[in-house]
Amino acid sequence: MTLIKQYSIATRQQRSTRIDSDLSPEFFQGLVYHGTAQSALETLFRQYSQTGQSAYTLTGPYGSGKSTIALLLTGLLHEDAEVRDAAIEVINSESKDLLDQSVVYSKGWLQIRSVGGVNNPVNTFWDATLEALLEHSATKQLHSKYSKVEIKSESHLIETWESLFNEANSLVDGVLLLADEMGKSLEFINKNRGELHLFQDLAEVLGRIDTPV
């Protein structure tokens, strides 16, 4: 018996995952929850609940599934019940129990999903932020306010995020900020003599605010 009669690969699983555009209930159908994904997610859950650490880096070679794991986390914390239910179907009972014990969920998390590239990461991050405010039903009013803000620098972005996250505290369970292709963002900042410590500064700010991030 050939393997083709036992397995099939969905077209969406034959290309790289885009965390900014691939999220849907259909994305999770047929997704394999392998040991690496389980270990990465459960380590994150434990660290978050036990230490209160807010910033994490998921590393690995190209094609190892980093973006897919990030999008799975996105689904698990998403406001949309259909998306979240589809993501929960992917993980096993051990991971589900650990998720319930480690992460507060009732309103859904505001989710900023940014992918680095050839553009200024400040603009990419801010565009992703405005899209996130529109995506969550409780933060649309904040979008009306913050869409008028013109972000001028890395430090201005962090200051504005701090203000925004504090305002969103009562509206959402927390803020999930995902920066995919971080190397490309750092390369752009370096070439244009920007602030290479952007992510370090961001991590420090996240540790000071009350909103879970």
Name what the model sees in each region.
Residues 1-64, 71, 77:
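Walker A/P-loop-proximal flanking segment of P-loop NTPase domains
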Residues 5, 12-18, 46, 84, ...:
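Arginine residue identity/basic-tract feature
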Residues 45, 134-135, 183, 203, ...:
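A structural alpha-helix within SAM-dependent methyltransferase catalytic domains
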Residues 1-22, 117, 121, 125, ...:
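Extended alpha-helical interface modules used as scaffolds for assembling large macromolecular complexes
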Residues 199-213:
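Sensor-1/coupling segment of RecA-like P-loop NTPase cores
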Residues 34-45, 158-162, 196-200:
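Short, well-ordered alpha-helical scaffold segments within catalytic/effector domains
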Residues 53-55, 59-198, 211:
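P-loop NTPase nucleotide-binding core
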